[in-house]
Regions:
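Structured C-terminal cap/extension of enzyme domains
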Residues: 1-124
Length: 124
C-alpha cells in the first residue's frame, strides 16, 4: 500500500466481514486434514537447512517426495527423480551430520526423513 485509495480499498474488504458458517468451517477443516494426510514432510522450502556439506538439496528432495504423496503418479515422479534430479543432490548422499536439523525452523527430523525418502523413491 502506497496510496490512501489503496488503504481505503483494503479496509473495504473487511467492511462486510462475516465469519465462516459451521458448514464452511467443517469443509475447510476436512480439506486441511486431507491435504495434511498426503504430505510426507512439512518442509516449507525456506532453505535454512542449506547448504548441506554433502551437496544434498534437502528442500528439492522433500518437494519431490511431497509431490509423490500429494499426487501419486509414481511413474512421473520416478522420471523426474531419475532424469531431472542431479545424483549429487539426492538424499542418498546424506551422512547424517545433523547440520540441517540444527538450522531447521520447523524442527523437522530431516536425517530420518531423507533416509525414508531415498528408500521410498528407490522402490519406484
Amino acid at each position: 500500500m502506497s496510496a490512501e485509495d489503496q488503504l481505503t480499498d483494503n479496509l473495504a474488504t473487511f467492511a462486510r466481514f462475516e465469519p465462516l458458517t459451521a458448514a464452511e468451517t467443517a469443509a475447510v477443516e476436512q480439506t486441511a486434514a486431507f491435504l495434511h494426510s498426503r504430505i510426507k514432510i512439512g518442509c516449507t522450502g525456506c532453505r535454512y537447512c542449506m547448504p548441506c556439506p554433502m551437496g544434498v538439496d534437502i528442500p528439492d528432495n522433500f518437494s519431490i517426495w511431497n509431490k509423490l504423496g500429494m499426487f501419486g503418479q509414481p511413474e512421473a515422479i520416478k522420471h523426474q527423480w531419475e532424469a531431472h534430479f542431479p545424483d549429487a543432490e539426492k538424499a542418498s548422499h546424506c551422512v547424517r551430520c545433523g547440520k540441517c536439523e540444527a538450522a531447521c525452523p520447523q524442527h523437522l527430523p530431516i536425517r530420518n526423513a531423507l533416509a525414508r525418502l531415498q528408500q521410498e523413491l528407490d522402490q519406484l
